[in-house]
Amino acid sequence: MKKIDVKILDPRVGKEFPLPTYATSGSAGLDLRACLDDAVELAPGDTTLVPTGLAIHIADPSLAAMMLPRSGLGHKHGIVLGNLVGLIDSDYQGQLMISVWNRGQDSFTIQPGERIAQIIFVPVVQAEFNLVEDFDATDRGEGGFGHSGRQ
């Protein structure tokens, strides 16, 4: 298992609010909690930035982190990330902030310590562009959206 440096920015993390952990041995994501003093009500269509009380420094350029919505909140309540996916670069060292968007029809209240997003760590390949005049031909060519059909 890869070690990632984590700094606790709020003294409640690790005490009142548990540190992120994998729920099962097969879990890909670690749940992130809302490090709030008071509940926040999010009206339909509204967004807000929610602190996690944690900062990370991945330090390895072959890794990045992605913050993703929790499936139950998205499906049942319309609570997703305002930027859809949060990308955390390996050299970032600041607090993890979660952009929360209520795309649902009803107001939603975020409680202090509530699990509102998840973070996963993914491999990264930094590419260098090779400028060309033309590409070698493929069967697909420039076929884009919907090109391969639905069935």
Curated annotation (Swiss-Prot):
Substrate binds at residues 70-72, 83, 87-89, 97. Keywords: Hydrolase, Magnesium, Metal-binding, Nucleotide metabolism. Its EC number is 3.6.1.23. InterPro entries: dUTPase (IPR008181), dUTPase-like (IPR029054), dUTPase-like_sf (IPR036157), dUTPase_trimeric (IPR033704). The keyword Cytoplasm does not apply. GO terms for molecular function: dUTP diphosphatase activity; magnesium ion binding. Pathway: Pyrimidine metabolism; dUMP biosynthesis; dUMP from dCTP (dUTP route): step 2/2. The keyword Metal-binding applies. One of its GO terms (biological process) is dUTP catabolic process. It catalyses: dUTP + H2O = dUMP + diphosphate + H(+). This enzyme is involved in nucleotide metabolism: it produces dUMP, the immediate precursor of thymidine nucleotides and it decreases the intracellular concentration of dUTP so that uracil cannot be incorporated into DNA. Belongs to the dUTPase family. Homotrimer. This is Deoxyuridine 5'-triphosphate nucleotidohydrolase. The lineage of its organism: Bacteria, Pseudomonadati, Pseudomonadota, Gammaproteobacteria, Enterobacterales.
